[in-house]
A protein has these predicted regions:
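S-adenosyl-L-methionine-dependent nucleic acid methyltransferase catalytic domains
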Residues: 1-305
Length: 305
């Protein structure tokens, strides 16, 4: 309970006040936090070029999973998360050496370090490196190093055991995850990622990208063909490749079953000469039957006249 003037001399209130004062004293101790790279500089040109290029990519891109209206470029998300977690070399040095004036050698070192970190970002944002473990691990190493530096700077903080655990990286939570670019890239960079959203479509997208695949990471496919093949050659089920193989297998099975049951409702169309007159691109296919990509359905009503 809260203490009032009437019972302010009770032993409980004395203890309660001491607890409050102790908690206030602990939280009043400042956390030493070097500026992050994103607060100082980023290779924006490289990030912008990669983000623009990404718009034309379809195969293997999360945008093909389901439509989302405000997707953020994965390249930009990856670069921003990296920049938010990695310490700026200059400010780190100033935190480690308070009151000392830097010399020319120090400044030269900072310039070289920033250039090195920029190179990591420039490699990181390339679409071709999205699954390149060498590039991703180089970024993860820098993130872990910065966390270790922050833990060392705050090792004497009263709450260091809880706030600065060397063995537990900070997690990332995107409260309005939308298309899932931020939590997906955080997960790719080795962080424990959490996503939430008010829109059920966004929730489903994020479940399909960051919640379900990790549960099956490194596990083999379980469909019948995979079990048969496993006895001959044991495949290497890296990441969620086993889950992906199952999705492909059972997706094809569902398509084949649908073809058997309702395929007659969607017949192939015979390309005629008349059709080719309006569509010259169909001329090579005159006399053949082609699969229709889209059907337009319309209700028909018998005319009363």
């Amino acid at each position: 309970g809260l203490c009032t003037e009437l019972d302010s001399h009770s032993p409980f209130c004395d203890g309660h006040s001491a607890l409050l004062e102790g908690a206030h004293a602990m939280t009043a101790i400042q956390i030493i936090s070097p500026k992050k790279l994103i607060e100082v500089a980023l290779p924006l040109d490289a990030i912008n070029i990669a983000a623009a290029k990404e718009k034309s990519i379809r195969h293997g891109h999360p945008s093909t999973l389901h439509l989302w209206w405000a997707r953020r470029p994965l390249a930009a998300a990856r670069a921003v998360i990296f920049g938010q977690l990695v310490n700026d070399p200059e400010d780190l040095w100033r935190c480690q050496n308070p009151g000392i004036e830097p010399n020319r050698q120090h400044r030269g070192h900072w310039t070289r370090e920033r250039a090195r970190l920029f190179k990591i970002i420039e490699d990181l944002v390339q679409w071709e490196n999205t699954t390149n473990e060498k590039v991703l691990e180089a970024a993860r190493v820098e993130i872990r190093r910065s966390w270790q530096e922050s833990c060392e700077l705050n090792k004497h903080h009263p709450l260091a055991t809880d706030l600065f655990d060397l063995d537990k990286m900070p997690g990332l939570h995107d409260p309005f995850a939308g298309g899932g670019a931020i939590p997906l890239e955080a997960q790719r960079l080795g962080l424990e990622a959490y996503a939430s959203d008010l829109n059920p479509v966004a929730v489903l997208i994020n479940k399909g990208m960051i919640e379900i695949p990790p549960k099956f990471s490194g596990l083999p496919a379980v469909h019948p063909d995979a079990r048969t093949a496993r006895t001959l050659v044991a495949p290497d089920w890296k990441g969620a490749s086993g889950l992906a193989d199952d999705v492909r297998h059972f997706g094809q099975w569902m398509r084949d079953e649908a073809e058997k049951r309702i395929g007659h409702l969607y017949p192939k169309i015979l390309v005629t000469k008349e059709m080719a007159l309006e569509r010259p691109d169909l001329k090579p296919f005159v006399g053949t039957r082609l699969t229709v990509l889209a059907w337009l359905w319309a209700r028909t009503v018998k005319s009363p006249s």
